[in-house]
């Protein structure tokens, strides 16, 4: 999911993904990571169709040279080492988007899954608050949240999720995303349930 795009949502839905990945952002953390996963083109196309029908600009891509990013590769390394799951990667880190676009995309994602006949797990990779520590210090604080304020708000968000208090969470989401440099990019329509 950590795939930055400048416009619209993009779905990478090749039949097969394989390569050796090194992060452009932090090559000293993630480097020379070999990967090979099966994809699910039908699901990817369905996601794009449902989202576009909901008014969210979305494109499905089956381009062999369109590689996976670490937001997909890192979770797959730990959860799909046996290639048990098919992979579809969604660019949900849009440089210019609204939270309502993200909400509608989440609802369309759910619709696309429900229209299929398989079992699907959705993994949202990223973080809650999302601000790296100051330059030259990432290793020193690699396992820490960069600011205590962000940590406290993140803990509150997790509590709201555990309680199923989607109404309160959705009400605070715009400020949370802004004030905590949020990487929470879309929500499903769980608040309607």
Predicted regions and their residues:
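Gly/Ser/Thr-rich active-site loops/lids in small-molecule metabolic enzymes
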Residues: 139-164
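Conserved small/polar residues in nucleotide/adenosyl-binding loops
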Residues: 186-193
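Internal, conserved structured core segments that host functional sites
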Residues: 45-99
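Flexible, glycine/proline-enriched loop segments at strand-loop-helix junctions
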Residues: 30-38, 60-63, 92-100, 176-178
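Feature marks hydrolase-like catalytic cores characterized by long aromatic- and Gly/Pro-rich stretches
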Residues: 165-185
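Active-site beta-strand/loop microenvironment that shapes enzyme catalytic pockets
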Residues: 93, 97-147
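A short aromatic-anchored loop/beta-hairpin motif
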Residues: 1-50, 58
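Short, well-ordered beta-to-alpha junction loops that form the rim of enzyme active sites
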Residues: 1, 63, 124-128
């Amino acid at each position: 999911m950590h795939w930055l795009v400048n416009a619209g949502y993009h779905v990478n839905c090749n039949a097969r993904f394989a390569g050796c990945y090194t992060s452009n952002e932090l090559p000293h953390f993630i480097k020379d990571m070999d990967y090979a996963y099966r994809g699910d083109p039908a699901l990817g196309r369905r996601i794009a169709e449902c989202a576009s029908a909901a008014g969210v600009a979305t494109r499905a891509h089956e381009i062999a040279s369109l590689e996976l990013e670490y937001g997909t590769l890192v979770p797959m390394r730990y959860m799909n080492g046996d290639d048990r799951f098919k992979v579809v990667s969604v660019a949900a880190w849009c440089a210019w988007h609204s939270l309502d676009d993200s909400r509608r995309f989440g609802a369309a994602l759910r619709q696309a899954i429900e229209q299929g006949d398989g079992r699907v797990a959705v993994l949202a990779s990223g973080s809650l608050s999302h601000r790296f520590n100051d330059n030259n210090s990432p290793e020193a604080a690699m396992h820490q949240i960069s600011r205590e304020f962000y940590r406290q708000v993140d803990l509150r968000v997790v509590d709201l999720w555990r309680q199923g208090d989607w109404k309160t969470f959705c009400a605070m989401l715009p400020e949370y995303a802004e004030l905590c440099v949020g990487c929470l990019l879309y929500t499903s329509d769980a608040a309607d349930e």
